[in-house]
């Protein structure tokens, strides 16, 4: 969920007043489909209270295994000491190759291509949900990222639905697994990043069949 501008500034103000640190994991921020990517907290933080983290594993491929942290100056030494204490850095060849990929503009072009590909997959998933699941689901949080949140009609059990999907070769995360407190709504997290549009459309047909079996 993307925070509103007022909430962002309120959080930064709280961190400054209490000398607290904010850990910002900018997960999947590159993949936004309805507008320009939203700026980071770190980019509007005048008080150096945000520790900004990211990875290239999602935008490129998992095997690259290179992430990064933008650390406020007061923490530079402590972070370097901690890093050296735990493990060595990513291989120099990986780092230099990635730096060249960024510097020459190839990464920006790659992101544009990936946004287009993931937008096509997201749209295929949304069309399939609308056609095959109808009023059995409510779709939320589809503007960015590589998954959508689907709330189920009252009376449907997301654990049971996910288990039935698993038996038919599909993976879905029950939303009830994600609550810290009491479960308020049953639902599913549906990923679309690694499937072609035709496969996603077929998967929504199976989901619709499973839901209707339980209604």
Language model feature labels by segment:
Residues 1-215:
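PLP-dependent class I/II
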